[in-house]
Amino acid sequence: MKITDKNIAIFKKWYIKDCTVRNKDFFHFSVRNIKESRKASVIDENTVTKGEVGIYLDGSPDDCISLQPLKNMGQLYIGSASYNSYDEVVCVDDEGYVYSRSCKYDSREKKIPFGIDGPLRNIITKIKNISGRLYIVGYNNSVGYRDGVNDWQSLCLNLPVFDYSKEKGRFGDEFKLRDIDGFSYDDLYVVGGKGYVWHFSGAEWEQINFPSNIYLETVCCAGDGYVYISGQSGILFKGRGNKWEKVSAGGYSLPFEDIVWHAGKVWCTSDYGLWCLDGDTLIPVDLPSEIAVAVGHLSVGDGVMLMAGMYGAAWHDGQEWHLLFNSVEWQSDDEAED
């Protein structure tokens, strides 16, 4: 199905913050209102309207896109997984407020439980599908997973807790988890802080002896059996357990937002570009100009990779790229109207 300018005109008022693959024909995005974002201060985040947008490649021209505006939510993350034979899309904000929808429901949910035992001990920084289950990770060693509607289970277990009341003058950077991935439910990795890496083997967490104290941002448990971890400036490590090697010295302006495994390769992206690991060499991907606008975030599932930036999105089928939309020109027109 051809997505027309009329279909995607909705993105004139919104820009993308995150994306997820529901299946090879359904792509979903967390978005935020552009005009409200320009006016809001840092402490007014919840006054900016957020939203969940779905694009359906198998739909008719009149029924290929949906929008659900969401009020009173903070920084919004989005993921998708299957439960009880139907798939769902789940949006969580940094404070643990939840919106979810599937073919059976479409509603706001109870806030994710907060407390020393988790799942939430502080703010959320990521939601990710691992082996068909949605996991969340965040500050103060927050880790948990979704077990159904209004059902979040803690995986904080033996992860240490930072006591802000007793540690005045410190921010507990080493407890600020940024990402999670895994080969299975019983083989998970979380990363964050300065060289802070933990491994879960099914019973408890074990801290990994990581060979660097740089700030860590992303992790990918890849199809080649290795774990890839990136940090500040795009520095990239490869390993597993307590054996690690640096495969890229970085030197980029921004850290990677996401690392994924797709089409037999490791892919990394930031707002400044897309890179692919060729052997042990990280090389920039030469993208057509209309696709390059979509760099920023990655999601994989059902054999495809979705890439989304503030003003565009594209997907890769394992062989070639397909543009979903590019709204950069619309944004220029909109700014002129302001």
Q: Over which residues does each language-model region extend?
A:
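Residue-level hotspots at or immediately adjacent to binding/recognition sites across diverse folds
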Residues: 1-338
